[in-house]
């Protein structure tokens, strides 16, 4: 029997909290998969198509407003109830056109904004725990997308079943998150970040300028790797046919720095493996033939290239997280940095899809 204060329970709660953190991005992904088409675009479908970059931008703003976060943390149950209601309504009307149910696009935008506190709240709690717990959290985030990829492959998106995992992630994830907050490891992590009596606040916190002073080198390397990723991906999209028609299946890379960092280690030695590997993969994507079978191989190599670059950026994220581990607000800062990277990558992939799609 697994006790609620055991390490197994902590891993399970962390995994389910990861699925909860994925819900605002899954919400955008669902509407993009159902209603966004490359062949024709209207004002409404454009909202769904660009919803993920806008969600990243809104999340960055929320990371910079800790007062708003504290207020929203007390209302997570109400947000969950509203989101479940919105999902049920959208599932009920998913077979109708927007002319008959014109409120659906507005409901999509409103619910996306309502779900934004979940990634911030879960990250703030989970990253007070030991590093192994972080892996389960990121695995849960990635696993939630894998479920929807499987549903897309099975072509069940025209059924109401397509919305069911989203509701399960919401309700189950929130219940797990509330248990996670009370876990002994999370409380111990909070205690380690208590300020001594000469500090002005209850917990140790860093300003943006203090964080920059501690992590200047890591941030510079992260930005350099991000620019290299953007330039390389642009070359793949504009010079090869690899990304044509793959937009919906590339959505995981829109949030890659929130879901793929778990494969990284906090050691720069890993870069001596990841970066040459990425260079080889990028070269193969460009030089291989253009036959149907070879195009599939090139698409897989492109995905591996992106995973390698995300893992390389994840090395710097892990180093930043280690340097800022004493601060209670370090998870918000790291989340903001990851979201900036995701915003750049998602904007680039969206533009490429519009240009070559």
Swiss-Prot record:
Keyword Transmembrane in annotation: yes
Coiled coil (UniProt feature): none
Recorded superkingdom: Viruses
Keywords: Host cell membrane, Host membrane, Membrane, Transmembrane, Transmembrane helix, Virion
Keyword Transmembrane helix: yes
Subcellular location: Virion membrane; Host cell membrane
Transmembrane segments: 20-40, 44-64, 78-98, 101-121, 132-152, 157-177, 219-239, 242-262, 270-290, 300-320, 333-353
Membrane topology type: Multi-pass membrane protein
GO cellular component, one term: membrane
Function: Participates in rearrangement of cellular actin to increase intercellular contacts and thereby promotes virus cell-to-cell spreadin$g.
Similarity remark: Belongs to the herpesviridae BMRF2 family.
Protein name: Protein ORF58
Gene that encodes the chain: ORF58
């Amino acid at each position: 029997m697994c006790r609620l204060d055991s390490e197994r329970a902590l891993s399970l709660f962390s995994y389910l909290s990861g699925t909860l953190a994925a819900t605002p991005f899954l919400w955008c992904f669902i509407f993009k998969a159902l209603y966004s088409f490359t062949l024709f675009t209207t004002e409404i479908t454009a909202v769904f198509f660009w919803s993920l970059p806008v969600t990243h931008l809104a999340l960055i703003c929320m990371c910079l407003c800790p007062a708003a976060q504290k207020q929203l943390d007390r209302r997570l149950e109400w947000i969950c109830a509203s989101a479940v209601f919105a999902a049920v309504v959208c599932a009920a009307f998913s077979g109708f056109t927007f002319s008959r149910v014109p409120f659906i696009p507005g409901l999509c935008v409103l619910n996306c904004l309502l779900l934004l506190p979940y990634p911030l709240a879960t990250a703030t709690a989970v990253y007070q725990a030991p590093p192994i717990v972080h892996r389960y959290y990121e695995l849960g985030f990635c696993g939630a997308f894998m479920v929807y990829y499987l549903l897309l492959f099975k072509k069940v998106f025209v059924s109401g079943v397509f919305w069911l995992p989203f509701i399960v992630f919401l309700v189950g994830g929130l219940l797990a998150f509330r248990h996670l907050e009370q876990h002994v490891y999370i409380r111990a992590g909070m205690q380690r970040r208590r300020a001594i009596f000469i500090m002005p606040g209850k917990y140790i916190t860093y300003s943006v300028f203090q964080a920059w002073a501690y992590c200047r080198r890591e941030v510079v390397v992260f930005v350099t790797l991000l620019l290299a990723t953007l330039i390389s991906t642009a070359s793949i999209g504009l010079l090869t046919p690899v990304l044509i028609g793959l937009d919906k299946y590339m959505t995981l890379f829109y949030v890659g720095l929130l879901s793929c960092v778990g494969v990284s280690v906090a050691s720069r030695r890993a870069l001596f493996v990841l970066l040459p590997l990425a260079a080889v993969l990028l070269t193969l994507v460009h030089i291989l033939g253009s036959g149907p079978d070879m195009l599939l191989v090139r698409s897989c190599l492109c995905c591996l290239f992106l995973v390698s670059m995300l893992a390389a950026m994840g090395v710097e994220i892990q180093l930043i997280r280690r340097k800022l581990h004493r601060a209670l607000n370090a998870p918000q800062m790291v989340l903001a940095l990851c979201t900036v990277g995701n915003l750049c990558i998602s904007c680039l992939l969206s533009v490429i899809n519009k240009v070559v799609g």
